[in-house]
């Protein structure tokens, strides 16, 4: 049996995978227009899922058990179990308190989505991207959220995680003189 979180962190801690799969992010340069960076980042995550043997789906809706619409940016389905094994949210982070709150909301989406899938996913990934130098997100807040659970906006109790790995990934872009963004650093670490 393979250590899936370690495989993911290995692939998403260097630029090698992205250089090979999505050079627009790391060597061609990309403009920060509309949702282009988001689309490319989600595509990169889907590509990694495919390379690791999963059926990767973009914007996959989770079962509607509590009334709120949630779609993970990338969902990796096990081809043998036919259930989601990995859920990913990819979000811009600007280094502000508002940005931290947005990442926390995305983490809550992952936790609730996992619950709605019957706790089938073995890995949840919160992936943030930023341009230029910004303050680092407070990862302790994320770990605490996973350990304590929360009450959703519609009143559903989302329990703490058990037997699920949580990874935090960062795509760090530099702003070039031309105004384009180039991915210069990637980080991936296990929170739980």
Language-model features: where?
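Active-site beta-strand-loop-beta-strand hairpin of nuclease catalytic cores
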Residues: 75-87, 117
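Domain-level recognition of nuclease-like catalytic cores that cleave nucleotide substrates
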Residues: 126-192
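Catalytic cores of nucleic-acid endonucleases
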Residues: 93-150
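Core alpha/beta structural scaffold of self-assembling particle/tube/pore-forming proteins
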Residues: 73-76, 110
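Acidic/glycine-enriched edge-of-secondary-structure segments
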Residues: 55-69, 82-102
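Hydrophobic, Leu/Ile/Phe/Ala-enriched alpha-helical segments that form helix-helix packing faces
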Residues: 12, 16, 41-53, 111-117, ...
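Short, well-structured alpha-helical interface segments that form or flank functional binding sites
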Residues: 36, 40, 44, 67-69, ...
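Acidic-basic catalytic patches of nuclease active cores, encompassing PD-(D/E)XK
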Residues: 1-63
């Amino acid at each position: 049996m393979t250590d899936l979180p370690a495989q993911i962190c290995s692939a998403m801690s260097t630029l090698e995978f992205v250089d090979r799969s999505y050079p627009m992010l790391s060597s061609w340069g990309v403009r920060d227009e509309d949702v282009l960076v988001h689309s490319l980042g989600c595509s990169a995550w889907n590509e990694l899922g495919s390379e690791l043997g999963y059926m990767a789906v973009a914007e996959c809706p989770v079962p509607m058990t509590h009334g709120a619409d949630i779609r993970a940016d990338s969902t990796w389905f096990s081809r043998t179990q036919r259930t989601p094994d990995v859920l990913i949210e990819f979000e811009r982070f600007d280094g502000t308190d508002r940005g931290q709150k947005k990442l926390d909301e995305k983490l809550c989406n992952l936790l609730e989505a996992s619950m709605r899938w019957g706790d089938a996913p073995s890995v949840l990934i919160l992936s943030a991207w930023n341009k230029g130098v910004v303050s680092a997100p407070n990862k302790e807040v994320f770990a605490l959220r996973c350990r304590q659970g929360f009450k959703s906006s519609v009143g559903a109790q989302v329990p703490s995680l058990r037997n699920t790995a949580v990874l935090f990934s960062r795509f760090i872009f530099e702003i070039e003189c031309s105004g384009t963004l180039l991915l210069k650093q990637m980080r991936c670490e296990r929170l739980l």
